[in-house]
Amino acid sequence: NVIVTGANGFIGKTLVNALLEKGYHVVALDIRFDEVLANDDRVTCVSVLNKEVSELAKEIPAEDYMCFFHLAWAGTSGPARADYAVQLNNVKLACDYIKLCAEVGCKRVVYASSINEMETYEYLQSDDIEPAGGYIYGTGKLAAHLMGETVAKLNGVEFIPVIITNIYGVGEKSARMIYTSINK
């Protein structure tokens, strides 16, 4: 049994399908679900729309969970990428989801980070780089990583950060360069 946030997103659906192929039961957390996920008996869909993360524990079946994959992140492209309110909310959600991971008895969280973490870190150490809106997203990812790792440690959860960079494929609908170039 595993839990996946952002399960209905571009990367989330691919991960869920790979997990299902390996025989896992998936608890999918997202704001909406397509029919493929919603109609699969191996998937338990839990809507997070208009809910506090602390309310979700009672909706997650009491099972032994091997891993909690945190993919959910608003504002990965477009104007929301530079919206500090959106990105700060993402940081809080990441920490709240890690606490939820511990609350449901899962001892391992995989946190989906971004290459923008490294770019932001370089920006913070340099006097030669002008700030841009994308650094708000990167700073959010970096903050979520650092705070999330701490929250995980304080709650007895193994924290595994993974960097996802320039991924594209079937189902992607972002405003990022590769997707928009392919569609032109």
What are these regions (language model features)?
Residues T5, L29, F68-A74, V109-I115, ...:
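SDR active-site strand-loop-helix element
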Residues Y24-E35:
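Conserved glycine-rich Rossmann-like NAD(P)H-binding loop of the short-chain dehydrogenase/reductase
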Residues I136, G140-A143:
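Active-site helix of classical SDR
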Residues V2-K22:
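N-terminal Rossmann NAD(P)H-binding glycine-rich loop of SDR-like oxidoreductase domains
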Residues N50-N89:
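NAD(P)H-binding glycine-rich loop region in Rossmannoid oxidoreductase-like domains
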Residues F68-H70, C95-I136:
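Conserved Rossmann-fold NAD(P)-dependent oxidoreductase catalytic core, especially the SDR/UDP-sugar
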Residues L146-K184:
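NAD(P)-dependent short-chain dehydrogenase/reductase
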Residues D40-V53:
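Rossmann-fold cofactor-recognition segment
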